[in-house]
């Protein structure tokens, strides 16, 4: 590899809106994110059930089912 053409690869802190922080490596000095594995519903197991009954009824009404 040629020297002087690659960006510096440093340890950085990733900060989530939920308050969770963790270390990783990146060429950016700081990383902010809205959702991380500590607060994402898929990883926490606290998935919200979406009530789709209104959508189903509207579909049936629209297409005469």
Swiss-Prot record:
Question: Where along this sequence does the record place binding of Zn(2+)?
Answer: 16, 18, 36, 39
Provide the cofactor note recorded for this chain's UniProt entry. Answer: Binds 1 zinc ion per subunit.
Keyword set includes Signal = no
Arranged from A to Z, the UniProt key words for this protein are: Metal-binding, Ribonucleoprotein, Ribosomal protein, RNA-binding, rRNA-binding, Zinc
Q: Which PROSITE patterns match?
A: RIBOSOMAL_L31 (PS01143)
GO CC list: ribonucleoprotein complex; ribosome
**Gene3D superfamilies associated with the record:** Ribosomal protein L31 (4.10.830.30)
What is this protein identified as? Answer: Large ribosomal subunit protein bL31
Q: What does this protein do?
A: Binds the 23S rRNA.
| Family, as annotated | Belongs to the bacterial ribosomal protein bL31 family. Type A subfamily.
The GO molecular function terms of this record are: metal ion binding; rRNA binding; structural constituent of ribosome
Q: Which GO terms are recorded in the biological process aspect for this UniProt protein?
A: translation
Q: Which gene encodes it?
A: rpmE
Which InterPro entries does the annotation name?
Ribosomal_bL28/bL31-like_sf (IPR034704), Ribosomal_bL31 (IPR002150), Ribosomal_bL31_A (IPR027491), Ribosomal_bL31_sf (IPR042105)
**Record note on quaternary structure:** Part of the 50S ribosomal subunit.
Which cofactor(s) does the record list?
Zn(2+)
């Amino acid at each position: 590899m040629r020297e002087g053409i690659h960006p510096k690869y440093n340890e950085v802190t990733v900060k989530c809106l939920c308050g969770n922080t963790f270390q990783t490596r990146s060429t950016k000095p700081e990383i902010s994110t809205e959702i991380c594995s500590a607060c994402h519903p898929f990883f926490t197991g606290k998935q919200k059930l979406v009530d789709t009954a209104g959508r189903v009824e509207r579909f049936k009404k629209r297409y005469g089912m």
